[in-house]
Each structure stands twice: as C-alpha cells, then as structure tokens.
Amino acid sequence: MNIKKKLSKALTNTVQFFANELSQSATDRDGEKKTVTPGMPELLRRAAADGAVMLENNGILPLEGGTRVALFGITGYESHYVGYGSGGDVNRPYAVSFADGIKNCDRLTLDPTIESIYREWNKKNPINNGFWGHWPFYFPEMPLDNTAVENARNKNEVAVAVIGRAAGESRDCKLQKGSYYLADDEIAMLDALAEEFDNIVILLNIGGIFDMSWIEKYKKVIGAILIVWQ
C-alpha cells in the first residue's frame, strides 16, 4: 500500500471515529448544561404550525373545542424530534410528544385509557434510538387489542394515528417496508382503526420521502392527513 492510500485510510478511519463514536447521541451529555433561549420555544411552535402541510381535509379540521381524541401509534408517544444528520441530530434540552401536546391543549381531551396502554407498552418495550447513521427507520408498533379500539370508538369522536420515519445523512431511506413503505404492523394498526372509526386523522412525523399509495385503501375513513415534520 503506497503512502497516499495509507494516509487516505487513516483519515477515513479518523473521520468515522468522530462521526460514529462521538456523535450527539453516542456521547454522554447528561452533565452538560442545557439552556433554553427566551422566546425560542414560542417561535418554534409558530414555525411548526406554519410549516405543517395539509394533504387532505374532509371537513374534520380544525377539531372543535371539547373533542375527545384517541391517540394511536408508538410515535404519538415516542416521537421523532430531529432531522438527522450533522445539522439535525441535536441534543435537545427537552421534548414535547404528540400526546403531551394534545394534553397541553385546553380545547382537546386525550383518551387516558389508550394513553395508559401505550405508556405501559413503552415501559416494557423501550425505544432504541440507535446512534449516528444507525437510527431505526421507524419504531415498531404495539399490537392493538380489538376490544380496546372498540371501547375507544365509543368514548371518542376522533382517532389520531401518528406514523413516523427516520432518514437522513448516513441513513438514507430504503425501498422497503418500515422505511419508504408502511410496515406490516402499521398496516395492522390502520386496519384496526378503520374497522371502528369513521374519522381518522393521520399525522406524518417524517422528514423525507414516504410512500402515500396506502391512502387509497383507507380513503373512506381518513378525515385528514397532515405532514407535521420532525
């Protein structure tokens, strides 16, 4: 191996070490001081609302005050917060999930039973967020109990289903289920909801390309679809 190849290999190994071993998610930053710039949370909330893309609305949005909401999907409780990659893989000071956001909204009521079921599942099946270039493309879904879904239908006006994806630098989207396409467990979740609910709001917690052909299958029960980004 000549000197140029040796130098190139050494440089590559060094870059990979710092990228993979010393990325934000792989280093221990618990002891570091995390600050919140005054006014920034309010600005980001406005930016998130203004940046949401409504793909479909069959008259269900905006939800009326007092609407009772059953929130489904692991990502509704363990959300994707970053854009992934050098500029997006951030060490956030705090995070607000979709479930937390609904509970913070005084106009809506989150179904506590469904929330409890998901919270308990997440405790027993904690999410592995991976590390640089090895983030999970999606969070595997919890199998839904048909009786729980039926009970939720009887107590709530609308079901909200959150579907999330992770893709970015060093972790490109793949043409496979659980990445570009819906995973089988996500299809099972939507099938269960479609059996009981007449209005389902779909929130897409994504930051890149995503197959949307599945909309045709559920068009009779989809009340709205929003891309809410990450």
Where are these regions (language model features)?
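C-terminal non-catalytic regions of proteins with extracellular/luminal or membrane-system context
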Residues: M1-Q230
